[in-house]
Design a protein with these regions (language model features):
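Phosphate/diphosphate ligand-binding glycine-rich loop within oxidoreductases
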Residues: 41-115, 129
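NAD(P)-binding Rossmann-fold cofactor-contacting core
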Residues: 155-173
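Rossmann-like dinucleotide-binding domain for NAD(H)/NADP(H)
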Residues: 218, 224-311
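Short acidic low-complexity segments
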Residues: 29-38, 51-54, 173-189
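N-terminal glycine-/charge-rich "phosphate-binding" loop or analogous flexible N-terminal tail
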Residues: 1-44
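Glycine-rich NAD(P)-binding loop of Rossmann-like domains
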Residues: 114-148
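Oxidoreductase and adenylate-handling cofactor-binding alpha/beta cores
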Residues: 97-113, 155-158, 290-301
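Rossmann-like adenosine-cofactor binding region
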Residues: 167-262
Length: 311
């Protein structure tokens, strides 16, 4: 079995992968450097590859994505019909939640404003700040990342509720969980609204003018899920009017965010370029490698894959 590894692995990671499939042939490269010949010869691909390259596959058994998202691979015929597809849901909870938590807390403490003053050599007091202690936090998308984020907020004394499509099963860190029908009521109560929702027909454009108007005056909004949740002009309007105290996003639509986007200059807006879920935190890559190794074992044993995706 030829196993094409596109992940930026180190020696320890290689040992983990190779011990999960002893005697098999491992080829290590990167997504950018992988050739059509390597892809054509692969029985297993570990990592994300340009979907157009998959047309070269001749006997692919498994495409194990390094990302939690997989939208680019769902179009009919993208992944060979006989191949299995799996993702890395569960690998990014720590990294993304810590990043978004830091963004929210920095907004609540006016740190971006103080950074601007520092660059201008100005010693000024920007006034009152807010706290997560006793704050009402609403998490949209109560999966792995949302659960990690809720844990961080609870550690600061916040009250955390969640919204998810199937609210009957959820991490115990949430004090309560509702379905989407309760969204307007919960938005009106929350001091912080943080979204980690995937991109679906139901979520695209969900954060629009009505959404922001329903939010509590002076609340904060954060998006670490998918950029197409937000109608950018409506978010800008909510910030410019002062209805929202601030917003923090690590995802936008489109990406990269055009230089002409009004989001760049919106007041009390903090933007990072979709980097919270990359491999900047070593633990994230460790998690991805562990999932890949587990699925190599499952594949050889004919067992159900972890994070299996129907396509």
């Amino acid at each position: 079995m030829n196993i094409l590894v596109l992940l930026p692995v180190n020696d320890r990671h290689r040992a983990i992968l190779e011990s999960s499939a002893p005697g098999e042939d491992f080829i290590y490269t990167s997504s950018d450097a992988a050739t059509r010949e390597q892809v054509a010869d692969a029985d297993v691909i570990l990592g994300n590859i340009d979907p157009d390259m998959l047309t070269a596959c001749e006997h692919l058994q498994l495409l194990q994505l390094q990302t939690a998202g997989y939208d680019d691979y769902l179009a009919a015929g993208t992944v060979p019909a006989d191949a299995k597809l799996s993702c890395s849901v569960g690998a990014y909870g720590q990294a993304v939640s810590e990043h978004m938590f830091a963004m929210v807390l920095s907004m609540m403490k006016r740190l971006p404003g103080y950074h601007d003053l520092q660059r201008e050599h100005r010693w000024e007091d920007l006034g009152p700040v807010t706290s997560l202690k006793n704050a009402n936090v609403l998490v949209l998308g109560a999966g792995d990342i949302g659960g990690h984020f809720a844990t961080l907020c609870r550690s600061m004394g916040a009250h955390v509720r969640g919204i998810k499509r199937h609210p009957l099963v959820y991490p115990i860190v949430f004090e309560d969980m509702d379905g989407m029908d309760a969204l307007p009521e919960r938005l009106a109560e929350a001091d912080v609204v943080a979204s980690f929702m995937p991109s679906t027909p139901e979520t695209r454009g969900l954060a629009n003018a009505e959404f922001f108007a329903t939010m509590k005056p002076g609340a904060f909004f954060a998006n670490g899920g998918r950029g197409d949740l937000v109608v950018a002009d409506d978010l800008v309007a909510a910030l410019e009017s002062g209805h929202l105290a601030g917003a923090a996003v690590d995802v936008t639509d489109p990406e990269p965010l055009p230089e002409t986007s009004p989001l760049w200059d919106a007041p009390n807006m903090l933007i990072t370029p979709h980097i919270s879920g990359w491999f900047h935190l070593e633990a994230t890559l460790n998690n991805v490698v562990d999932i890949a190794a587990e699925n190599l074992r499952h594949l050889q044993a004919g067992e159900t894959l972890r994070c299996w995706i129907e396509h």
